[in-house]
């Protein structure tokens, strides 16, 4: 039990020692770029392939029927994409 407590205390201290300190700007810059990834609001959304999802046209199979499942361009799925309205 004592070893477990010592291990937890050591890992907690290690986390605080290795945490990123924004005041250490020269230490976090590597060849003109940041060592750590940029904040979400600084990222380029056009660089992400996940933001470019194609939708399925009307009369094509869309899977399990859910309304607004995100697969159909119209938003209506009943095994095939149905027109909106």
Curated annotation (Swiss-Prot):
Tissues with expression: Expressed by the venom duct.
Residue ranges annotated as propeptide in the record: 20-53
Cell compartment(s), UniProt: Secreted
PTM sites of type Glutamine amide: 84
UniProt keyword terms in alphabetical order: Amidation, Calcium channel impairing toxin, Disulfide bond, Ion channel impairing toxin, Knottin, Secreted, Signal, Toxin, Voltage-gated calcium channel impairing toxin
Signal sequence, start to end: 1-19
Processing and modification events after translation: Is not hydroxylated.
Bridged cysteine pairs (disulfide): 55-73, 62-77, 72-81
GO molecular function: calcium channel regulator activity; ion channel inhibitor activity; toxin activity
GO cellular component: extracellular region
The protein's role, per its UniProt record: Omega-conotoxins act at presynaptic membranes, they bind and block voltage-gated calcium channels (Cav).
Domain notes: The cysteine framework is VI/VII (C-C-CC-C-C).
Similarity annotation: Belongs to the conotoxin O1 family.
Protein name from the UniProt record: Omega-conotoxin-like Am6.5
Higher taxonomy: Eukaryota, Metazoa, Spiralia, Lophotrochozoa, Mollusca
């Amino acid at each position: 039990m004592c070893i477990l407590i010592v291990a937890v205390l050591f890992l907690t201290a290690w986390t605080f020692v290795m945490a990123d300190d924004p005041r250490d700007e020269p230490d976090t810059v590597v060849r003109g770029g940041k060592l750590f990834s940029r904040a979400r609001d600084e990222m380029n959304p056009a660089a992400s392939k996940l933001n470019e999802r194609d939708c399925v046209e009307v009369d094509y199979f869309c899977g399990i029927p859910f309304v607004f499942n995100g697969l159909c361009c119209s938003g209506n799925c009943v095994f095939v994409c149905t027109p909106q309205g």
